[in-house]
Every structure is written in C-alpha cells, then in structure tokens.
Amino acid sequence: MANTTGKKIKDAAIIGGCASLIYLTIGDISYRLSLSRGGLNSKLITDMVAKSAAKKPKNEYKEKLDSMIDDGADWFMHQDTEKIIIEKKHRQSLYADLIRPDKPSNVYIICIHGYTSSPANMGIYAKKYHELGYNVLLPSLRGHGDSEQDFITMGWNDRLDVIEWINYIAERHPESKIILHGVSMVLQPP
C-alpha cells in the first residue's frame, strides 16, 4: 500500500515538474517574442506584418495615417538632430534626439514614441512642433532605437527615464517650459 502511495506521489511530482517546465518555456518564449528587440521589433516580423496588411482590403483612413507617419519619419531623418546622451554609472545610458527650432525658444516638447516604435515615427508630431518654433526632444525608450537595453519595459522603467529627461532640460534651461507628448504605453498615471 505504502509502495503505491509513494509511486503516485512520484508520478504526480514528475507530471507537475514537466507541466511547470512547459509553462515556464512558453512564458519565456512569449516574453522574448513580445518584449525583446529580436521579437516583434525584428525585420522578419515587420515584413510578415507588411505582407499580411497588403492582403487585407484597403482602408482609406489607415492608408492616409500610414502615409502621414511615413512623411513624418522621412522629415525626421532629414533633420540636423543633436544626439543627447545621459550617462549612467550603474545602468544603461539614455539616448535622445533633439531638434532645435530656427529661432531660440524656451519651450521643450518631449515627444515619446510607443511600443515597437521609434523617435522617427514621432516625426509626424515633431515636425508640427518644430514649425511652431519649439525644441523637440525625442528619446529612444528602453528596447527601442538607440537604447542599450535589449528588452522593452512597457513604460514601467521608461516613466523614470522621462523624469530624467525633464530634469536634464530643467537643469540646463531653468526658465524652460516642458510639455510631454506620448503615444501608446507612455505617460500612464502612476
């Protein structure tokens, strides 16, 4: 009797261990696919999405929006941006592009991109702010663009980075007015 109880416990432990291993493996694959640079940000995935989108029925609104985003990204790529780096001693440095207006201004817009995006994709907004005569700072969030981090933090650590950028501007330009503009996962209330 004791022998069969011991066997049942052993079998249950083996099954539980295997189930846990499968669960952890699936979780790790999902995490790496959705939150790493090689996941949804990879060229393979973006090419697959583009091919899939090409097969879908035309949507005038989406086509117009995509065209505007592409125009903004093209504008951004042709700007003379100043590369800003906040060096960190014990963690990855922060990176951003700064586009200065034609005439000096004390207004700074921090334009923050969203999930699987980049500062260039915020060009649609940066262009308008630049035309209005504002300084535009476009940070690369963690796991995106110039960022040193390999994984996306879905805004959790990025919120602290935004505070760093605000402090960066305020320390150098105490009279500045700072406006935050973000899409997707950023600027969520704490």
Named regions from a protein language model:
Residues 13-86:
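An N-terminal hydrophobic leader/cap segment in hydrolases
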Residues 89-100:
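A short loop-to-beta-strand scaffold at the N-terminal edge of the catalytic core in hydrolase folds
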Residues 106-114:
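Short beta-strand element of the alpha/beta-hydrolase
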Residues 114-124, 136:
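Serine-hydrolase catalytic-loop signature spanning alpha/beta hydrolases and amidase-signature enzymes
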Residues 126-148:
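Conserved alpha/beta-hydrolase
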Residues 152-173:
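Alpha/beta-hydrolase active-site loop
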Residues 173-184:
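Alpha/beta-hydrolase fold nucleophile elbow
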Residues 189-190:
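Hydrolases whose catalytic domains are alpha/beta-hydrolase-1, hotdog thioesterase
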